[in-house]
């Protein structure tokens, strides 16, 4: 079925705004809740923002790259958009759910499509205790931080921190240490997708830590729990032969 009603959104970048004007004039602009498909014009950061803002609509999102990297985006072209949408392959992503507790007792809930990261917020290294499914697995990780990522997010911050790239269909999460000092050679672990990961911050007042879920931060955390959220799904559209699985494989040979 060829989508007839398309809702366009764009980042603030001039090139994305120009594309928005061109595409909306050519294909029409439908209010997002009434659209058959949403077309996001921008880069990966804007795609993540769009997925977060439209997650309650259950409408597929097709990205067109008007940014830099564009890992989650398709190539930009003004012609044949409806045909591309009709032929696109859909990928379903389940995000991570983060529950962060601060030293003041505040509780924050966040959703992350790529990763949840903990980062030292002061000059001293973070000290983290790591538990998985209620069992302490590491009493003390001395590091700049740590993260938990989905397969879709494994090529982002995780890969830069020397974490593994995960196949898109793998039912696993990557737990990756960021600049670990002790244990010095410990890089991280692969965990079942169903795992509940908990970080407890040791000596949080002296060694403050912030938690970040896809760019949305919580400062002065004392504990963070992370799990997959199966009740939330994000629908991404990709051109045939250029889905996430192909992109993940290609990323490892560049």
From Swiss-Prot:
Major location (coarse): cytoplasm
Subcellular location(s) per record: Cytoplasm
Any one Gene Ontology cellular component term annotated for this protein: cytoplasm
GO biological process: NAD metabolic process; NADP biosynthetic process
NCBIfam families: PRK04761.1
Family: Belongs to the NAD kinase family.
Protein name: NAD kinase
């Amino acid at each position: 079925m060829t989508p007839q009603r398309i809702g366009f959104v764009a980042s603030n970048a001039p090139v994305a705004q120009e594309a928005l004007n061109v595409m909306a004039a050519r294909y029409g602009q439908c209010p997002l809740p009434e659209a058959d498909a949403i077309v996001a014009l921008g880069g990966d950061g804007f795609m993540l923002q769009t997925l977060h803002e439209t997650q309650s609509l259950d409408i597929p999102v097709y990205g067109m790259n008007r940014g830099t990297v564009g890992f989650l985006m398709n190539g930009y072209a003004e012609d044949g958009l409806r045909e591309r949408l009709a032929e696109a392959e859909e990928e379903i992503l389940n995000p991570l759910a983060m529950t962060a507790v601060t030293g003041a007792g505040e509780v924050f809930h966040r959703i992350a499509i790529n990763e949840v990261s903990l980062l030292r917020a002061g000059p001293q290294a973070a000290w983290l205790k790591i538990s998985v499914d209620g069992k302490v697995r590491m009493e003390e990780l001395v590091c700049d931080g740590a993260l938990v990522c989905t397969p879709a997010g494994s090529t982002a911050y995780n890969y830069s921190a020397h974490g593994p790239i995960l196949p898109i269909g793998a039912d696993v999460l990557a737990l990756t240490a960021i600049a670990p000092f002790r244990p010095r050679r410990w890089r991280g672990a692969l965990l079942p997708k169903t795992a509940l990961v908990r970080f407890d911050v040791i000596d949080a007042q002296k060694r403050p830590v912030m938690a970040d879920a896809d760019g949305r931060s919580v400062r002065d955390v004392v504990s963070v729990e992370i799990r997959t959220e199966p009740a939330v799904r994000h629908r991404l559209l990709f051109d045939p032969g250029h889905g996430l699985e192909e992109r993940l494989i290609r990323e490892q040979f560049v």
